[in-house]
């Protein structure tokens, strides 16, 4: 029977008028045409693909030991895996499919069979989520497979590796020759107990599998899954099942203890009820009375079917007419009969009120469906629907009054209400019923019951299978949101489901603590399946039984009690065995040096602690697994079997230590496991993973991490002038003479000197100094040095005057100050333009022509001032200007005559020679035209050009600059002598802190050195500690590169005395005079307080200098110099070690990973490296050699190195903060996660579409042949993303990956738009994407694997990073000057000294379905903005910070 959709149209309208306005999309007498109440898989008008609406909560996939055992068994032979519901059969199938895909030849497929469409959708979701790297397809009857051709099948299976279908689909394909049994590599039979009699399962095996096997032709491997292989307690049925499936039934009996621990048993209660109809306040069901009356009033001669037959003139139609009238078998008659019968059953089962609501609701849905979809009176089939609708209208049936009491409810319903209200725990419940309609009606009753609804949030779940071409029964009250309810139940938003037997088996739901069998289970198997849903501790199971059927119930109850008793006896047997065996184990592990010891009693707890310290990654199981094996050797019947235990450690443990067996046999599983744990811990100690205190090595490393002190007292700065003065006092020292040229900002040479100093000067970069915020000067010191034979100290005064103009220059600039000016300055300047003398200062009286004589400018001096202060000359004034026009008047201004010549001058600067451009003056320009006024008659003019005075003023900067090079040269000569660094300029950069305000500081080169250090240490540790897990390697690396360790290295090497931290102070500055230095040499060594980070930064800067000077080899030498215990080896050597350690050698790449090499455009020489790189640490499957942890450890450093090298080499050179921003933007987990999701391979595939799909012309209202038309193939491109190749076995990771995939599909376009053309880096979008770290870990593991395979160079890795999009995005960020600063950091800068507060709250969504985050931003206690609707806490902060930045910048 057909059922129809909901509608809000008025029922009083004429149906023919309504119908004639709508063109029917499908024949309403055919398959269901209503899409409003159908799931996508049920709708024949749509694609039967449960894709977007698949449940997000995937079956738990953490492999337990007994599941791994079942996998091993299935790899050896065909098996039927018999395990309780909820114990993880599906995971065994997933592991088996993965193993098959690795070996499966091209052209074969894995065929996964499930008995129902619901299970097809369930298992499709699981396979798709767990094995996303291959094409997986689901095919059911809804795909119209009965009309598929050979071409259709070939297209549908193109590039498909796993196909999930109902058994009838496969059987039909085999029967018609579209699929050959030899093309199947593996067949998985879900709910394999159905394989009996004439079931499609059985026919596939008997008619095709066994026929081919008998002929010795290839046949697929078999894996059956079941929770109850014995049907109706018939043991012989097990033998038949094994024979039919050519498989042996296997249950993990070797792990019975663990299996029982993972399968909780609920307490069992029976509820006896009276099935008789209960009295109803509104009388016996009024609606049912009206419905039966309407049925009795039907006139068969008015039936549309009869009318249409009477209009035909043929013998066939006459025979049909006679039969229809005689038997009253028409659509209308059958529907009314069924409606009345089912309404009566509803009244008996649930009560009269329930029957009234059922009748009114069914009629409402039927009528509303016609309004929604329409029908045409041109077809007699539509005429039947219109006729039936008018019958319902004429019956005038109204909904019952609201349910306020138990009146009108059956005793059975009243009992379930009592059970629910009396249940005193936080419930997670399933109520099993028999009929589809009962689920809807009972759910409605419980939902509208005030007390029940306050305690339970109730949903429904029914089966969705149907046969295409058969009318759907609207009397089933089709529920609209089964999959949504199931998802809400999984997420905890609903805590009770009313469901049919569809939830008995197969479909994965969370563990429950309350199971209600509203209808008695049909057999023991159904009971076992339902009981398996109650896996929580202290669960309850209620069985409802009619008081008239107690005898039948007692027989079933006896079976169930027997089952319980068997399980209880098993528990008791295990306990008795453990108590009976004496623990005679003399062996112990003792460490003589520490006195530590370990016995068998402590071994399991120690081993558990060791595993928990291996890593702190999410989604990784942190506990050992134990396998129990019965030893058959020497076993006699009747003897207690002897056992051995094998402990399995996580894949991050070296393979040789990962599986350890007990040293002897035991009767008790417990003792065998303790023995295995002891042997395992002993092996770990011998391998060096446990220290001499018998504690995990990680614990000791964490304790040994050096704590960086707050500040540290170190040596004072090395003074090179003291060393030079000491050398000069000991004998003649040759002078180093160099040309010093001074030029302006236009590169015009202003003057030239000879710089003389009694020490060899290294090559010096040009010194750029700023005179003020507008003008700069450049001092170039030629690199070609001329060494004089003698020191001018011993020359006469005339010679000194001729060869040393330093004192004159100082007098020009500083003579008016309190500076002591003498002739014994170590650094001397000699003018190339002729001799300079003190007599030339203020030599002549002022005359206008003298100030700018010979094209030069000269200083003027005030002779009335005892210090003879110098001034810049500006103009001549014929008379004294008013005092109001002068910014500052001199003393005695008012007494001087008005009618006299005056000079307008500017004051000589107190401070200049800045290494960095100073800020422009902040004060507003003065309105007074004259800065200073001097009388012309008391003013004199220098006869030395102004540029020499400027040079004198720059002497502090020149001495400071020279001192930097002398300090660096001494550092190179002493501490860094083994490195033979040729570029002293870079050493100057490396030893200067930012606080010194020198021309350059170490921040840029330290940025490079930091990455070089971590890369060198990382690859060396990985190569020299092959047996250590990544977690321990990370701690060892952190210990070697920590600021505390580097600080200690700096002090141990006496590097601290070469670190420049204080800037040049010109106030009180004195030149380095020989006489003063002789006195200082007698003073004790000075001390200073420095930050340990500053000392550590200098070490990293020197490593960077070494790299620039001599590449990685010299950088390794520098690391060896400062951190001798690291003993770094050349990159070629460590790469060869790592490459040689890859196992197994020469392996063939698994078939499912061959596509990955094409995707990344790199073919591995050692395929084992690629397999290791794609293996997540949760993948604890037998045979796994290693996981990607160690490769990720390497790849993280290599990726950082590649990015740092790229940004460091950019021209023009970037500032340190710019490089930090770019590195942060390019190697964070968010962008790497996004890029690995975006990076995909487009594989060709075909979708099977209806012939009339998308073709409105073929959908005529009366045409019923369109369903028979042949389907068509539509070519598609199936994306296979890079992340899908990661092998993992974690339920939580799979769920997180599926949820992240949905977010990625939502955010992909806006993120790509921002990356391609946005002005800002998409921090907020990435925060919403919230890619977990395993995405970036996978990316980095691939980088590490490529380097080990292709190294020791980085070209292959750099090419991979470029293909990923990281390097192109770097160019885009630079080209378009994208704003990269993180919003939270930017907000902190905009706020200045005001405090920024993020007030984050977790709230319910507006629809009450789930939670979201909101954030309010306050700056300085003031509200700025707020955001809502965020998925994550950090996202709310980032979004709020982004908005706050925009608001503050506008202000």
UniProtKB/Swiss-Prot annotation:
Residue ranges occupied by any Dicer dsRNA-binding fold domain in the UniProt entry: 603-704
GO molecular function terms attached to this record: ATP binding; helicase activity; metal ion binding; ribonuclease III activity; RNA binding
Requisite cofactors: Mg(2+); Mn(2+)
Region described as Disordered: 34-53, 1253-1272
Enzyme Commission numbers on file: 3.1.26.-, 3.6.4.-
Alphabetized InterPro entries for the sequence: DEAD/DEAH_box_helicase_dom, Dicer_dimer_sf, Dicer_dimerisation_dom, Helicase_ATP-bd, Helicase_C-like, P-loop_NTPase, RNase_III_dom, RNase_III_sf
All residue ranges annotated as the RNase III domain in the record: 968-1111, 1153-1351
Domain of life where this protein originates: Eukaryota
GO biological process, alphabetically ordered: defense response to virus; regulation of defense response to virus; siRNA processing
Record: residues binding ATP: 83-90
Every Helicase C-terminal domain range: 412-582
UniProt cross-references to PANTHER family, sorted A to Z: DICER-RELATED, ENDORIBONUCLEASE DICER
Assigned protein family: Belongs to the helicase family. Dicer subfamily.
Name of the protein in its database record: Dicer-like protein 2
Species assigned in the record: Cryphonectria parasitica (Chestnut blight fungus)
Phylogenetic placement of the source organism: Eukaryota, Fungi, Dikarya, Ascomycota, Pezizomycotina
Gene that specifies this protein: DCL-2
